[in-house]
């Protein structure tokens, strides 16, 4: 579409948007959850109908713009606003029903609202390498950030009903930080808040997540009269040292190449025989009465990494075709797992040139595996950048 058309749509947006095994323990006099999203043993429900998450991770980190610097901006460059709007339209056109946001400026929610018929998962980004999550300063800054993100969402969805699937309280906290926090606070083994009460054998890191989740729910309810589902995104390296069944559902970031490296003794999948399917089945079996959402899966096509190929593929070194076939294999593994899963989010929509800061963001490093996970690539056009679909975009569109 033409830039002028996007600008008119953006003007419309801006003129219509204003300024452990115990679950949530809502007090007896507290109203019922106002969210349209709920859960059963296996699925997330939207308006009491099973809702299979078909998601994509989206970070609007275009060259020269860092996500953590534009997050608070309310006056993004017009070229970036056009690109964000175009990206969200294309994500919807691909067949996705959910975008997983983190570091999202207000305009992302405005664009999602005007595109319509799309949902989102909101990540609360916690300093994952903090040496002590029980540090009062870490708690205070995390709570401040929770307020900022929730306020930003409701400044757009001021009718009080954002299409918010869940708030993710943290993503992949580091193993060293978890272990150091737990070692420093052996006396912390329980949390009791306004909405979350855990059992008495949790760790200090788990108590931190419970406290932040309780705060998010309390702030959202008391400020906006809405209560969203809450989760935490774990990963394979920390699967044995952090567990949060006191949240609404279980989330894991799961990558096919990581399983043979970190869990080589994982049983083969019951249907496809892959280690990836075996791993997600193991995760689900740990909490068979709670939904399991795969909040990230993806493959990097970084050119200078070693090539591995199917069925596990590699951490980088994949061809564009292998990225497409590998992602479809992951979706098939999820779809045919022994117990139903709640869905998946593909990591990620755009290549992330920005991973190592502003100077790095102007070019794509062939040696940096993390910069090449996108299902679309960035191409310079004049003084800005356009996107070009990779094979995986069309493959996902046909699958979904």
Q: Residue locations for each model-derived region?
A:
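Active-site-adjacent "subsite" loops/lids of carbohydrate-active enzymes
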Residues: 75-76, 80-81, 126-153, 193-201
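Bacterial Sec-dependent N-terminal signal peptides
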Residues: 16-32
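Aromatic-lined carbohydrate-recognition surfaces of secreted/lumenal glycan-active proteins
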Residues: 165, 199-241, 288-303, 339-349
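Active-site groove signature of glycoside hydrolases
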Residues: 148-203, 231-236, 342-343
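Aromatic-lined substrate-binding rim segments of carbohydrate-active enzymes
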Residues: 81-140, 205-208, 212-231, 280
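Glycoside hydrolase catalytic-domain groove-lining segments
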Residues: 224-227, 238-313, 331-335, 341
């Amino acid at each position: 579409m033409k830039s002028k058309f996007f600008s008119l749509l953006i003007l419309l947006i801006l003129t219509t948007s204003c300024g452990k095994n115990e679950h949530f323990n809502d007090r007896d006099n507290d109203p019922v959850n106002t969210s349209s999203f709920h859960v059963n043993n296996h699925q997330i429900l939207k308006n009491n109908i099973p809702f299979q998450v078909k998601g994509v991770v989206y970070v609007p980190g275009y060259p020269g713009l860092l996500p953590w610097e534009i997050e608070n901006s309310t006056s993004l460059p017009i070229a970036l606003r056009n690109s964000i709007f175009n990206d969200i339209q294309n994500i919807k056109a691909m067949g996705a029903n959910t975008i997983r946001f983190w570091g999202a400026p207000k305009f992302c929610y405005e664009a999602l609202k005007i595109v319509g018929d799309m949902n989102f998962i909101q990540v609360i980004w916690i300093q994952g390498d903090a040496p002590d999550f029980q540090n009062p300063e870490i708690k205070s800054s995390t709570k401040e950030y929770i307020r900022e993100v929730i306020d930003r969402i409701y400044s757009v969805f001021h009718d009080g009903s954002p299409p918010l699937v869940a708030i993710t309280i943290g993503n992949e906290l580091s193993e060293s930080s978890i272990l150091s926090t737990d070692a420093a606070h052996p006396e912390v083994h329980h949390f009791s808040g306004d909405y979350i009460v855990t059992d008495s054998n949790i760790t200090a890191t788990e108590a931190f997540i419970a406290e932040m989740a309780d705060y998010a729910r309390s702030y959202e309810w008391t400020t906006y009269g809405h209560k969203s589902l809450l989760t935490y995104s774990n990963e394979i390296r920390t699967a044995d040292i952090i567990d949060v069944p006191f949240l609404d559902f279980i989330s894991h970031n799961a990558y096919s190449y990581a399983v043979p490296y970190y869990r080589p003794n994982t049983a083969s999948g019951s249907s496809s025989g892959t280690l990836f399917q075996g791993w997600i089945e193991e995760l689900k079996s740990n909490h068979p009465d709670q939904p399991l959402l795969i909040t990230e899966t993806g493959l990097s096509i970084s050119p200078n990494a070693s090539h591995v190929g199917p069925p596990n593929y590699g951490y980088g070194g994949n061809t564009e075709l292998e990225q497409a076939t590998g992602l479809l294999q992951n979706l098939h593994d999820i779809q045919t797992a022994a117990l139903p899963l709640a869905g998946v989010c593909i990591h990620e929509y755009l290549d992330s040139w920005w991973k190592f800061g502003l100077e790095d963001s102007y070019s794509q490093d062939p040696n940096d595996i993390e910069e090449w996970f996108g299902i679309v690539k960035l191409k310079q056009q004049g003084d800005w950048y356009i996107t070009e679909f990779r094979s995986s975009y069309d493959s996902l569109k046909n699958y979904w």
